[in-house]
Amino acid sequence: MATVAMINKAKATPKYATRRYNRCGVCGRPRGYMRRFQLCRLCFRKLASEGQIPGVTKSSW
């Protein structure tokens, strides 16, 4: 879990725009980020399996 200080640091506007990075909106995780949902892969999987993300279905082949 990300610390509060790291989440606040990511929210602040940096001196240069290229230094900005994405974090999960739920847990603050910086890796495995899915831009379309603004979630990390772990939170996305949990919320999708609970049916809380509309339009997302489990696929099998």
From Swiss-Prot:
Which keywords fit this entry according to its UniProt record?
A: Metal-binding, Ribonucleoprotein, Ribosomal protein, RNA-binding, rRNA-binding, Zinc
An example Gene Ontology CC term for this record: cytoplasm
Question: Per the UniProt entry, what are the Gene Ontology biological process annotations, in alphabetical order?
Answer: translation
By its UniProt entry, which InterPro entries does this protein fall under?
Ribosomal_uS14, Ribosomal_uS14_bact, Ribosomal_uS14_CS, Ribosomal_uS14_sf
Q: Which cofactor does it need?
A: Zn(2+)
Q: Which residues bind Zn(2+)?
A: C24, C27, C40, C43
Query: Any transmembrane segments, and where?
Result: none
MF annotations from Gene Ontology: rRNA binding; structural constituent of ribosome; zinc ion binding
Q: How is the cofactor bound?
A: Binds 1 zinc ion per subunit.
Function, as annotated: Binds 16S rRNA, required for the assembly of 30S particles and may also be responsible for determining the conformation of the 16S rRNA at the A site.
Subunit and interaction comment = Part of the 30S ribosomal subunit. Contacts proteins S3 and S10.
| Protein family | Belongs to the universal ribosomal protein uS14 family. Zinc-binding uS14 subfamily.
Q: What is this protein called?
A: Small ribosomal subunit protein uS14
